[in-house]
UniProtKB/Swiss-Prot annotation:
Role description: Extracellular aminopeptidase that allows assimilation of proteinaceous substrates.
GO MF entries: aminopeptidase activity; metal ion binding; metalloexopeptidase activity
Protein name: Leucine aminopeptidase 1
Annotated Gene Ontology cellular component terms: extracellular region
Keyword Protease: yes
Cellular localisation: Secreted
Disulfide bonding pattern of the chain: 322-326
UniProt xrefs under InterPro entries: M28_fam, Peptidase_M28
UniProt-annotated binding residues for Zn(2+) 1: 188, 207, 273
Annotated Zn(2+) 2 binding sites: 207, 246, 355
């Protein structure tokens, strides 16, 4: 790359917003961006200050982290005496709503998954600081709202942005239950090219376009249950699409920080991040499977998810690990909420095209994504109707 071209690109690569009087913003100059530092946590209690370029260098090395600059106190109330103590997580011993859930599976659609993913990957990038990232979030919110309206559920179900200062907002769809006990299903909507995030294409088909459309499809189908739409279930369901996961779990930290401060009663959170790539698993001579993350997760919730997969999916699960702060479930966990994470395969066989221009639909299996949609749908329905107070009393 010629030096003159590099000089033109650097300001765009490092651009960040600066707050001015009256809540207006302007991009940072290159000098300001070069001087900006971020406080990150790469393992529990192991923090350091880095520049933005150093953040991306760590990610290129496969090192994940929380960017705790704006939320250094996430999880601070867990061990305090403020408010009632958190109850231990308890989940059903086995799935019990097969008669309601399995008939819904016939409505899951590969064509819906593909159509939505084609559109979602058509944005040049979904980098959270880019205007494309803002546009993709606006499109996604519109699609979620359209899904709710087509189900005739707009009187009961809501979808709205959770706003962030960097431009790309997170999205929360809420299906109210009889109580504020809440079950969360999440995916992240942003994508990134780790070499020139503000400039190079980042279609993000698998990471995490696949998870985004997977939980959208699960939402579409669960809204075909009249009992769910009319709120006959005791527990509230929320579907989250997080912004800025790639920047250090920024969007999910903001949401779960707010929930922690509000003392929201989140009973369970499941993250779907990368749900479509099976090529390396098959090439290794291994069976197609769902990867169940077993490190830095809630073990009881994870055991329940294994039972969901065994009961409702057509393929087995494999236990795997992904390390600290590897996706948005980590924000829920840090805030004190039981969280779990499933991925497309054993971690070592997951998609090797991510974070580049080559994270494309052509490498993905929509049949495999349907398995993740079945898991998501069953998980949501089973826990929507779970009697958590009785479970916590040992009944």
């Amino acid at each position: 790359m010629k030096a003159s071209l590099l000089a033109l690109l650097l300001p765009a690569v490092s651009a960040r917003n600066v707050n001015l009087a009256g809540d207006t913003q302007r991009p940072m100059t290159h000098e300001e961006a070069a001087a900006a530092t971020y406080h990150i946590e790469i393992s529990p209690g192991n923090t350091r200050w880095v520049t933005e370029d150093e953040k991306w260098a760590l990610r290129r090395k496969g090192i994940n982290f929380f960017d705790i600059t704006d939320h250094p106190d996430l999880g601070a109330t867990i061990n305090t005496l403020v408010g009632p103590p958190k109850k231990k997580a308890v989940f059903p011993k086995k799935p019990t709503y097969q008669d309601a859930v399995k008939p819904l599976f016939t409505n899951l659609s590969k064509s819906h998954l593909e159509e939505n993913l084609e559109k979602f990957t058509s944005f040049h990038t979904r980098y959270y600081k880019s205007d494309w990232g803002r546009q993709s979030s606006e499109w996604l919110l519109g699609k979620v709202q359209e899904t709710i309206k087509e189900a005739g559920a707009e009187k009961y179900v809501t979808a709205k942005h959770f706003k962030h200062p960097w431009g790309q907002n997170s999205i929360i769809a809420t299906i109210p239950g009889k109580t504020n006990q809440t079950v969360v299903i999440g995916a992240h909507q942003d994508s990134i090219n780790l070499f020139l995030p503000s400039i190079l294409a980042a279609p993000g088909a698998d990471d995490d376009g696949s998870g985004t459309v997977t939980i959208l499809e699960a939402l579409r189908v669960i809204l075909q249950s009249k009992d769910i739409v009319k709120g006959k279930h005791p527990n509230t369901l929320e579907f989250h699409w997080y912004s800025a996961e790639e920047g250090g779990l920024l969007g999910s930290q903001a949401i779960f920080s707010a929930y922690e401060k509000e003392r929201r009663d989140v009973k369970a959170m499941l993250q779907q991040d990368m749900t479509g790539f099976i090529t390396r698993t098959i090439q290794a001579g291994l069976p197609e499977s769902v990867g169940v993350i077993v490190d830095f997760v809630d073990p009881k919730l994870t055991e329940f998810i294994k039972k969901i997969i065994t009961e409702y999916c057509d393929i087995p699960f494999v236990e795997t690990k992904c390390g600290y702060a590897c996706s948005d479930h980590a924000s829920a966990s840090k805030a004190g909420y039981p969280s779990a994470f499933v991925i497309e395969s054993a971690f070592e066989y997951s998609d090797n095209h991510i974070h580049t221009t080559d994270d494309l639909i052509k490498y993905l299996s929509f049949d495999h994504m349907i398995q993740h949609a079945k898991l998501t749908l069953a998980f949501a329905y089973e826990l929507a109707f779970a009697d958590f107070p009785a479970l916590e009393k040992g009944k």
